[in-house]
Amino acid sequence: MTRALPDYYPTVAEDVITFCGIQGGRVWVDLGAGPGGLGLALLENVSDGVMVLMDPSADALRRALTAAHERGVYSRAVAVIGKAESMPLPDESVDVVFSRGSFYFWQDRAQGLREVWRVLRPGGRAMIGGGLGSGYPDWARREFIRRQRQSQARKGPDAVREFREARNPDTFCRLANEAGLKAFEVIGEGGQDPDAQNAGVGIWLRFAKEAEDVG
């Protein structure tokens, strides 16, 4: 019998909070939220503020709102149909944008990053990429990566190459530069080596919109 792996959303949420901080009254955006796993895990760890769950799939958002109701955070969750390349939000209207796993599927990733920058308020932060969370158990991280490798191998060498290229730090840096980001950091190596101590981190593009960057 295949051993069940623990949920990684709580540990990823911890990493997002560590980078973005917790302040009262914040507006958060879970971009590419799907059924809301990460956004709702984060809501459970902050006492106030609003979570915008954004996804192009209305069905996924319906499931996210159902889950929000079941987890007691429905009053602070807002579902918005939208995609990264054209976010239906005003300029400088949110405090934090994060996205786990959807970045690899954006049609125009550089444009999506420009949109994230546009909607961030001065002082806002963004964390875009994928991973299991730095606090994810070692045994589970190794098993997750092993299963992931097997899944990609079954799709053929081209799929393996594309998968690795999408998660390469150089790819993240190139896209950030194409988007015109002035200051950013890429953390993690892509989470492809199960023996690496920071493999659970995965890979993330992190940046802040400072007041002096506006104008």
Locate predicted features.
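A short SAM/SAH-binding and catalytic strip from SAM-dependent methyltransferases
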Residues: 96-109
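A short glycine-rich, Lys/Arg-flanked "PGG" loop and its adjoining helix->strand segment in the class I
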Residues: 110-122
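Short alpha-helix
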Residues: 162-180
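Core SAM-dependent methyltransferase catalytic element
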Residues: 179-215
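Conserved class I S-adenosyl-L-methionine
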Residues: 125-152
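A short acidic, Gly/Pro-enriched loop at the edge of an enzyme's catalytic core
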Residues: 85-96
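Class I SAM-dependent methyltransferase SAM/SAH-binding core
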Residues: 27-86
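Conserved alpha-helix/loop element of class I SAM-dependent methyltransferases that forms part
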Residues: 7-24
